[in-house]
Amino acid sequence: MEFVERYVNKYASADYHSCADESVTHQFKSLLTQCQRYNNKVKCNHLAKMVKKIKMANEILALLKMKVIAENKAEQWRNEKVQFREDLEKFGESLIVAASTSEEHISELEELREKVELLAKQNDLLEEKLKDCEERCRLREQEVISLESKAGYELNVPVSVCPVTEQEIKDGEQGIRPQTLPSPTLFSPQSECARQRINNTYVPTDNNIHSNSALKIQEVISLTQILGKFDTNLSPISLYNKLEAVVKQYNLGNKDACALLRAWLPYQLAAELRPPVGKHIGTLSNINENWGSTSERLRELQRILGGRDIRGTNALENARYRKGDDPMLFCTDYLSLYKVVFNCPDMLPDEPNFLYSMANKCNVDYNTRTALRYATSYNNFINTLRDWSQESFEFQRHISVAYKKKQSRRFPRKCYSCGKYGHIARFCRTSANQHDTYPIHSIQRQEGDAQENLNDYLLDHSPPSETETVVSSDNIDTGSNSAGDQKESQNEPKREFHTPPCKTGKEGTTAPPFIPWVNIPLWLYSSWSHIAMLMLMDNIAQFAQGVPNTNMPVF
């Protein structure tokens, strides 16, 4: 070993460095890399034998360095192993100690649990006893009140009104106490005489039955149902009279009357009540004098209802959301009206009572109204209402489009005047224009032909009793029976039919009539109807005999 050290000290030229914090493999790799680097730097001017010695010395030095690192690491691992073994021994000892102490703690915990259960049972028994004591105290108070009221009644009522029976006298001599009925509750039926007897005796104040005991929640709910809905449109005086009637009927004290008023009012108005109606004055709340009297209750009602805007109240009552309205605009207007009417400017729009009230003002279907009533927020309410509006609009739009498509079908019939589809000849504009431009002389010629045919038919079918000769529609002489008169009448010029002027859009223009025989005299109409009746009777008779009619006129 000494020879190796001398050899290394003589020929080695490397200087190795390593980090003790790194792992052994990393340190060994670093030493080998440094050794190779130093061997590559050996100058070539040395002899080959000298170069080999230097490289070998560097490699031996690297191996010695690795040996030292390995020994140090082995020593470190050995120390850590010893330390771990000591720690394990200490941990095992602590586990043994903890296991021994845990049994003691478990026993202590079980004892504490048993004590807690025992105390809970004792607490339940004490609560039951306390409830029994309270019930007994309440019954005794009612008995005392009934006895005092009865004693006061016996002192004030004369003997003639309530005579004492013989049985009561015997009971008094034997020392037997008379049986007293239990005190009537708040909602037990009382006769008018008994109620008047209680009101006129015992205490001079106006609330004597429930002056020491507060109303229960069920009793308050029953009284509010008796009062009915709080109508904001009524005057404060009428609302006050309704409240005081219930207060006097059930003999409520100031504290109970104020509690009933707070429960009857909407929560926005109840929050505006000031002491001593909204809250008691003084330190004790069980004393009736610390609560508001009848005049103070009336003053508070007038204050919270008198400052409200009647127009705003009417607008809030008449507010409605209908199909086609803007949901955002309706909700914004209703929110502002609600805050003004109920005097709550700091109210959040997500208030459930406000959303429920606004949902009742919407004219929507049942499912949508239910969703609006139980909306979680103001924005959710608006979105639900907007979705319903869009769905109804799309449905209406679909119906209108289908209706338009149905109405867009053309008229299937054809006009025989112009040959076009969509109308009939009666309403044809082309034929109307043709009638307007029809020549007058052709109409006169057609009228003349029709008149001649009519005259010939009347001459052939005139009745035998009449000797008249129809010559012309305007030149008829009823008294002429001779042939000369007939010739003269035939030689007279025929009367021309002049069309009356018809005002159109322009002055100076005339339109011929569509019926050429409008100017036929009335007697000719009557004769024609008589002839038509005779022909009809003749045709009916021939039809009954089975003979065809050959005398039908042909025009």
Curated annotation (Swiss-Prot):
Keywords linked to the UniProt accession: Developmental protein, DNA-binding, Metal-binding, Zinc, Zinc-finger
UniProt biased composition (Polar residues): 464-484
Transmembrane segments: none
One annotated GO molecular function: zinc ion binding
InterPro entries: Znf_CCHC, Znf_CCHC_sf
Keyword DNA repair annotated: no
Zinc finger boundaries on the chain: CCHC-type: 413-430
Pfam families: zf-CCHC (PF00098)
Protein's UniProt name: Posterior protein
Tissue expression as described in the entry: Expressed ubiquitously throughout the embryo at early stages. By mid-gastrula (stage 11), expression is concentrated in the mesoderm and ectoderm surrounding the yolk plug, being strongest in posterior dorsal mesoderm. At stage 13, also expressed at a low level in the pre-cement gland. At mid to late tailbud stages, highly localized in mesoderm and ectoderm derivatives in the extreme posterior of the tail.
